[in-house]
Amino acid sequence: MTNIQLVIKDDSNSITLNVNRDTLCSKIDYFNKMFNNFAESTKEIVSIYVLNAQIVRDLIDSKIYDREITADKKNWKYILDLYKCQDYFGIEIDSELMKDLLVPREYFGHLIDVIDLIGYNKHTVNTVVQNIPIDFNVKVFPPKLINKMVPVITDSIKVFGSKTSIDIVCLKTREIIYSLPTIGSLCNCFCYVKNKKMVFFINELSQLVAFDIRYGTSNIISLRIKKEDFNTNPYYRKNILLTDVLYRRNSDLQIIPTVNILYNKISNQLIFCHNHKHVVIIDVESYRVINMYTHSNYFDVNIDNICRYVNHNTLAINHSSNIIALWNLESYEIHTRPKPNGIINLTALIYYNTYIYKNKFQKIFVNEFYLPNKPFELKPKHSGEITFVGCSPDNKYIVIVVDYCQITIFDMEYTLSLYASCKCVSRTYIRYEYPLSIIFGSNNTMSILFETNKKNIVHVYSLKSKKSLKNYV
């Protein structure tokens, strides 16, 4: 075999290559079959008609010279036609270029045709989810594709409290999947249990609801403490005040969460405050009330909020009086600690004995329950109204947001002295109105929901790099 001229033609272009026939046959099986079984085997000039002449030239060069084809993600049509050409010539397809590819809405069908050629893998399924038009009927997809899409969609879900609803947002498709109506004052009283794909919230009728994201179904949870339950639950009988409350009412106690709802992954339990008087623990599987905490001065003292340290079974209960109660969720032992002067809001537990609080002068402090240390003030870089204080899941970062989402991040390095190693590491200004909701991710990210010009905008912000990673509309 000798050198030949290969003429590559498409509808608008023609490219001629001088190639060695032996090399071409050894690199691409399509040409091996052509030059050994068909009339082209004796020709010195061979013409082929293809979808895109330039892409086929790139393919041939990449195989002959062992070069990788690269393409800008913006050149989506080149990438899709490249895959079609690879399929036509029987060249093994690498779906790496499909990763995070975005195509215009009107070419979504073209994208699906190409993915059918490639097959369903992590890159192609992610790309389908990212490009689905909002009004597209996914029921036309093959069941195999739908089954692979479900975990991709659910894994990219964030749940935010907006003005009158709990919004379930898919960051892959950039849309609100479900909007669950609630009471405005309880729009942030919800709990997203990611491993179960469940959202627990209070609806507009003041009912506790379990919403299954996978199936879009709701289950109203009716929680009642009955007198006869005291015969089977020893924890109830220990709660003398609760017993007294029940018998004074001479009726069952209807349980409705208020303030905030927490999830204890260790024991698979929900924890919340009822009517600002009781802290209730329920089993997530059976929705059975397991235990309740009631302050000794039931009629005069309210429970303002509760906080839990994720890596330790300890719950901090912030009372309207001058104490904070620490409730061990394994032994159910209770220890009380006096509040520092002026505390109005217990914000977070960053260790089993260390907490963040806000005082009546809108100042943020870190303090320890068991050591006589002076509270350490966290001073944000901006002045104004503090709209959010929170701690990342790994307790490494404390975030304070002032006014129009001016963010100050504190790095908490736990060495011998907590306060000597607490320092401000960054500040960022994002030009939007007050954030509607802020939630932390498990990978040191923070998702911030804004409303501007009647549109919801989600910023995903990296606590590690101190940068906005992505914006979703």
From Swiss-Prot:
Pfam families, per database record: BTB
Domain BTB, chain residue ranges per copy: 2-72
InterPro entries named among the record's database cross-references: BTB/POZ_dom (IPR000210), Quinoprotein_ADH-like_sf (IPR011047), SKP1/BTB/POZ_sf (IPR011333), WD40/YVTN_repeat-like_dom_sf (IPR015943)
SUPFAM superfamilies reported for this sequence: Quinoprotein alcohol dehydrogenase-like (SSF50998)
Family classification: Belongs to the mimivirus BTB/WD family.
Protein name: Putative BTB/POZ domain-containing protein R765
Organism per entry: Acanthamoeba polyphaga mimivirus (APMV)
